[in-house]
């Protein structure tokens, strides 16, 4: 942390105002300092927020995902535990926090071995196969650069070698390892061990030399006990060979040290293994009541892990450079053992320890090259190399004031800062309380606004419902009026048609009566003419008789004529009487007809009224019947829909079941064909071997049989 150099003037001018913006920038992300369980920070991950990867009685692995594809894992192995072989998908840079153990890995097709101790830093390259055996309880912190996933699902930082091997089919493995099928069957059928197991080997007797390769293969991938046996069977690495070197932060001299603390940085110049890597390592130990001066890293992001004690961290948000009027310009939070905090590149920071405990943390920087942190205060302050007049103008102060400000601090990098952390914590608590108060006020304000909005919405909804109800009532009223008008119009039309029909019937009856009267008059005229003709005939006969009898019958003739005239008069009177009777009879019939018509009209009106009532009753019954039929139809449609869905679901299940059965049958047939092919190949190989053996060793003649 003490390796620094002076950057160009233009860079420092950008950060002069930044240092004095002291408020939190978490306002941008809507969060507050996270030592309170109810809050979180984008730059802080608490110990209990880690993601569990592996958890067994022999150890555990938890992880933290950092932005930009950085992945940190916390690996803990109990004494005499074994982390099973893994294939790295990315570079792995790690730091040993506590304990000891053995790291084994494959390097250029040869197996390498490295003793791990507290404080060791080392790197394994991408594509390396490794495993770890702990002696004492071992705690390792590792960082991986997993980047963006190119496959779905993501492979992660590493894969189990056992899973990779068993991903191939039996035929491929049998051909590759040249082992019998029963050996591979044992591998397939064995229970998968957890990633961390107990490394105690079980008691065993050495078998034949020809069985060693078989047992080794099985023990590598079958069970926990057999994996640990593999460790016992390995040949010991020649100690005279050159070992890979680690860098131990506790054995090397620190880069900076004074009474307030010390710091050390590990980069590619200190550790050859870091060459080509994207990570460096650093460690800081602050004594009680100390502080690392405000500074920033211009070339790398710093991902830190608290190893011991508690402390306060303040990070300034560079996005607030444009104006210090923003009341959220920096973020302060409290960290404790096991927490992870991140400081992005170019973000000024300061770490402080409390007066009652020291503060120790290590971390990874996202660059293996030598970093040059830039300090704003102390003997190494970048402000000292700037023109004092420019600095004075920048702060709007006099040169003497700036001179006193820059010369007051005699220390550099790590300073004594009594009660700084406590003051920062108190300020943070006040900020949190104030933020909580503002949030509660904001919540109350929003609640009131929502309540008012809800009331307005309810009032608006009631008005809309009332308007809708009135509109529906108006529509219903208009509909009823239209229906009544339509009924009245129909009734009027029916009455007009009925009146027209009755008028037509009346006219028809009058016409019939007139025709009957005319026929009667014609008949009477015809009778009168016939009577006249008959009288004329009789008269002519009488005249003939009278002519024949002349004188003697003259008197009788006159008498006869008188008598006939009398009779004619009587007949006429009789006919007039009959006509009068007929007229009276017709008048009586007409009166009776009118009475009957009036009665018929009243009966028809009564029948029409009853028919209208019956029609209305039928309409009501028809509407009720249609309503019942509609409800029954809807119920039937719902039941049909449910039955159809059930039928489709059963069809899909049947199709899926048939597909699975066919797939299982296909796989079974494929497996049988492969087994038959393997058997045929094995028989051919055995026959070839027998033939080769026969050609190599011809049959010996049999000894003569004893007699």
Swiss-Prot record:
Bias (Basic and acidic residues): 439-696
Alphabetical UniProt keywords: Coiled coil, Glycoprotein, Signal
InterPro entries in the cross-refs: Cupin_1 (IPR006045), RmlC-like_jellyroll (IPR014710), RmlC_Cupin_sf (IPR011051), Seed_Storage-Functional (IPR050253)
Annotated region (Disordered), positions in chain: 439-707
Biased amino acid composition, Pro residues: 698-707
Glycosylation sites: 60, 203, 285, 356, 396, 399
Domain of life: Eukaryota
Record-stated family: Belongs to the 7S seed storage protein family.
Protein name: Vicilin-like seed storage protein At2g18540
């Amino acid at each position: 942390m003490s390796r620094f150099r002076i950057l160009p003037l233009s860079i420092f001018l950008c950060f002069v105002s930044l240092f004095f913006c002291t408020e939190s920038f978490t306002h941008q992300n809507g969060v507050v300092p996270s030592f309170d369980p109810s809050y979180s920070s984008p730059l802080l991950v608490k110990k209990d927020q880690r993601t569990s990867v592996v958890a067994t009685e022999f150890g555990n692995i938890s992880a933290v995902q950092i932005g930009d594809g950085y992945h940190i894992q916390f690996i803990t192995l109990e004494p005499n535990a074994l982390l099973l072989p893994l294939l790295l998908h990315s570079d792995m840079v790690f730091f040993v926090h506590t304990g000891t153990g053995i790291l084994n890995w494959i390097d250029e097709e040869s197996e390498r071995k490295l003793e791990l101790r507290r404080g060791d830093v080392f790197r394994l390259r991408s594509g390396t196969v490794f495993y770890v055996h702990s002696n004492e309880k071992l705690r390792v912190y590792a960082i991986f650069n997993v980047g963006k996933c190119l496959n779905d699902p993501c492979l992660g930082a590493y894969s189990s070698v056992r899973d990779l091997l068993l991903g191939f089919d039996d035929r491929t493995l049998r051909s590759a390892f040249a082992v019998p099928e029963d050996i591979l069957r044992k591998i397939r059928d064995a229970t998968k061990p957890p990633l961390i197991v107990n490394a105690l080997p079980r008691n065993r007797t050495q078998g034949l030399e020809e069985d060693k390769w078989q047992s080794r293969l099985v023990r590598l991938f079958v069970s926990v006990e057999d994996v640990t046996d593999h460790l016992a069977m390995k040949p010991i690495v020649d100690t005279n060979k050159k070992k890979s070197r680690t860098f131990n932060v506790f054995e090397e001299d620190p880069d900076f040290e004074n009474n307030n603390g010390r710091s050390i940085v590990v980069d590619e110049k200190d550790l050859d293994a870091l060459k080509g890597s994207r990570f460096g390592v650093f460690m800081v130990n602050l004594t009680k009541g100390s502080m690392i001066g405000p500074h920033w890293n211009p070339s790398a992001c710093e991902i830190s892990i608290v190893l011991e004690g508690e402390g306060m961290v303040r990070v300034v948000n560079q996005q607030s450079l444009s104006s210090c009027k923003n009341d959220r310009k920096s973020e302060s939070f409290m960290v404790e053992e096991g927490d992870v905090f991140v400081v992005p590149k170019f973000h000024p920071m300061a770490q402080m320890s409390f007066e009652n405990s020291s503060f120790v943390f290590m971390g990874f920087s996202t660059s293996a090259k030598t970093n040059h942190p830039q300090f704003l205060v102390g003997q190494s302050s970048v402000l000292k190399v700037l023109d004092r007049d420019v600095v004075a103008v920048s702060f709007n102060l006099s040169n003497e004031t700036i001179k006193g400000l820059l010369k007051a601090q005699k220390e550099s990098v790590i300073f004594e800062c009594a009660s700084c952390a406590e003051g920062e914590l108190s300020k943070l608590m006040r900020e949190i309380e104030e933020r909580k108060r503002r949030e509660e006020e904001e919540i109350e304000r929003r609640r009131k606004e929502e309540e008012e909005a809800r009331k307005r919405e309810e009032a608006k909804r009631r008005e809309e419902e009332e308007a809708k109800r009135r509109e529906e009532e108006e529509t219903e009223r208009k509909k009823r009026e239209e229906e009544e008008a339509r009924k009245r119009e129909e009734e009027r039309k029916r009455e007009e048609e009925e009146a027209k029909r009755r008028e037509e019937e009346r006219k028809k009856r009058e016409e019939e009566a007139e025709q009957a009267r005319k026929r009667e008059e014609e008949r009477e005229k015809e009778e009168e003419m016939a009577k006249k003709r008959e009288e004329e005939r009789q008269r002519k006969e009488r005249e003939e008789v009278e002519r024949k009898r002349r004188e003697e019958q003259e008197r009788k003739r006159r008498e006869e004529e008188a008598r006939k005239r009398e009779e004619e008069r009587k007949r006429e009177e009789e006919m007039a009487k009959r006509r009068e009777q007929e007229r009276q009879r017709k008048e009586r019939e007409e009166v009776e007809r009118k009475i009957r018509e009036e009665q018929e009209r009243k009966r028809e009106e009564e029948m029409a009224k009853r028919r209208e009532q019956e029609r209305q009753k039928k309409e009501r019954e028809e509407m009720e019947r249609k309503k019942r039929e509609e409800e029954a139809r809807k119920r039937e449609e719902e039941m049909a829909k449910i039955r159809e869905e059930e039928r489709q679901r059963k069809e899909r299940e049947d199709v899926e079941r048939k597909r699975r059965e066919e797939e299982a049958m296909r796989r079974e047939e494929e497996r049988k064909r492969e087994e038959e092919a393997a058997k045929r190949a094995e028989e051919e190989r055995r026959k070839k071997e027998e033939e080769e053996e026969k050609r190599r060793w011809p049959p010996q003649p049999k000894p003569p049989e004893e007699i």
